[in-house]
């Protein structure tokens, strides 16, 4: 069996800068450091190339590997509030942006590649982004919007609730891969 911990990056700074360059806040750095002991036994660590994800991974594990395809969904030209709409229609996308289905395929390809590199019995930490992770989970889970204004979701796997609320920074999911 192979195990992946799929984690959202820690708390980012607020500010006006390109999405991929947003660093962790001081609170986010402290939260990431607090996770180091929990993940001290991971064999490998992979990260989105976005700064906040890389910083999270670097605070938790030694020598994270950057995987370009783990980046956050490309929003494009958002002319309307699209957060709820993307969950109502997984093919919806803003001009120049990605749909949840496109992100799901990209993330699944990246994670399948990571799992393919792992040896039996290994554990990996994968640091990415809330929407990208949720898009990946659409391959296996039901996702229902509970409160669009607060970006709250209910995620269920085979009828069992695994998240009900906001996907918090430095939180995530444990995924087991058997007989791949």
PLM region spans:
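Active-site-proximal alpha-helix that buttresses catalytic centers in soluble enzyme cores
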Residues: 2-65, 95-101
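Generic beta-sheet signal
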Residues: 4, 120-131
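Short active-site segment of divalent metal-dependent hydrolases/proteases
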Residues: 12, 132-133
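Glycine-rich phosphate-binding loop signature in dinucleotide/nucleotide-binding domains
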Residues: 39-41, 114-122
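Short beta-strand scaffold positions
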Residues: 47-48, 105, 127-128
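Active-site signature of alpha/beta-hydrolase-fold catalytic machinery across serine-
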Residues: 59, 135, 139
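Phosphate-handling substructures
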Residues: 60-109, 163-167
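Acidic, low-complexity terminal tails and accessory targeting/binding regions
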Residues: 72-82, 88-89, 120, 138-180
